[in-house]
Swiss-Prot record:
Its EC number is 2.2.1.2. Belongs to the transaldolase family. Type 3B subfamily. Transaldolase is important for the balance of metabolites in the pentose-phosphate pathway. Pathway: Carbohydrate degradation; pentose phosphate pathway; D-glyceraldehyde 3-phosphate and beta-D-fructose 6-phosphate from D-ribose 5-phosphate and D-xylulose 5-phosphate (non-oxidative stage): step 2/3. The keyword Cytoplasm applies. It comes from Streptococcus equi subsp. zooepidemicus (strain H70). This is Probable transaldolase. It is found in: Cytoplasm. The active site is at 83 (schiff-base intermediate with substrate).
Length: 214
């Protein structure tokens, strides 16, 4: 399984990348806006830090607008993946872009049919949202399982990016269900390395060693 960082905070990306567990980065307009910096500059900086797919999202609403934006964004770096919303216009754009060899990540997937349509249109990645489905009482894990089953059954080349990840339990569950990738907010990365028993165990080791050295 691959781990992507779901952030545009360059310093956080640089720090977490040193752990050797980051395979890519995802961003969206909300994440970019929180940084208060130029979109293109931020994406290019991220591409210099992480050697893997870096998702950058279009903001146009029509297929024509998305295609024009995507062509421009794709020129920023070879690792850039253009994020496209799961809409009818988004599917039109994905179809054109896939034929041009531009990698796409179709986002805001909440149903099997949406995922299937995105894959048929040529999406490189599809992003079902875990936390947001839980918010409305739906089962995100069944969605991941169903999408992975369809990929395996029909041989689609798309990879599943489990998004809207909020807890370590989310990561563990989607890993067990076969999601290819989990995209994880930077604060959660730190929490995934921690456990009270680990902390207490290390403390005990150090205390015992200090007593022995005396």
């Amino acid at each position: 399984m691959k781990f992507f960082l779901d952030t545009a905070n360059v310093e956080a990306i640089r720090a977490i990348n040193e752990l050797g567990v980051v395979d890519g980065v995802t961003t969206n307009p909300s994440i970019i806006s929180r940084e208060g910096r130029d979109f293109e500059t931020v994406i290019k900086e991220i591409c210099e830090i992480v050697d893997g797919p870096i998702s950058a999202e279009v903001t146009g609403l029509t297929a024509e607008e998305m295609i024009a934006e995507a062509r421009s964004i794709a020129k920023w770096h070879d690792n850039v993946v253009v994020k496209i919303p799961m809409t009818t216009e988004g599917l039109k754009a994905t179809n054109v872009l896939s034929q041009e060899g531009i990698k796409t990540n179709v986002t805001l997937i909440f149903t099997v049919s949406q995922g299937l349509m995105a894959m048929k249109a040529g999406a490189t990645y599809i992003s079902p949202f875990i936390g947001r489905l839980e918010d409305i009482g739906a089962d995100p894990y069944q969605l991941i399982s169903d999408l992975r089953g369809i990929i395996d059954l029909y041989g689609f080349q798309a990879e599943i990016i489990a998004a809207s990840i909020r807890t370590a339990a989310h990561v563990e569950a989607v890993a067990q269900l076969g999601a290819h990738i989990a995209t994880i907010p930077d604060p959660l990365f730190a929490k995934m390395t921690e456990h009270p028993l680990t902390t207490n165990g290390l403390k005990t080791f150090m205390e015992d060693w200090a007593s022995f050295k005396q």
